[in-house]
Amino acid sequence: DEIQFNETTLWTGRSTDLSGGGSGYGKYENFGSVFAENLNDAFDFSSEGGAVNYYRQLDLSNATGKVYFEDKNGVKYTREYIASNPARVVAARYTASEPGKLSLRFSMKGGSIKGIKPSYAEDGGTFSGKLETVSYNARFKVVPTGEKATVKATAEGIEVMNADEVLLILAGGTDFDAYQQSFVSNTAQLAGAIEARVNDAA
């Protein structure tokens, strides 16, 4: 599962005099992706052990996307996605028809920006950096439920094991400010603002 995300203010380039041809204008950058890797041994991706009854749904009336599939043992899995403009987050909800059947590794990587190195701790991951003008920060948080659910941070990502349900919250942003001569503001507060946005939505 890959959730690719963007943000309208993630641009390379610098402020420039348009009479000079706009040579410093730069270009839009792809922010990155969050991946959900299945760790459940019910899937071995052979012809006999792969997912069955797979289908996708896009509901334009409530702006949600869904994916449904089953494993070889008949357990049904649902993944639901929504991007909330008021909360300024992307959310994904992972469920299974039987308790304790969700085991997933969540990780993230940068998009078109080179050299991004995510870090993982406790219940989420983050990466940050600076382009020529703007600084950027992205973060995700996982919230599992279930009596046997566990969460562990590794070098490869956040591992959720034996959960009944998992909620993923993702947000990203920059310090771009069109009203400042430098086109940036509150750089030191950016990481905290993104973290607060994710925690509030969770």
What kind of region is each of these model predictions?
Residues 1-202:
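Aromatic-residue-lined binding/catalytic grooves and analogous aromatic/hydrophobic interfacial grooves
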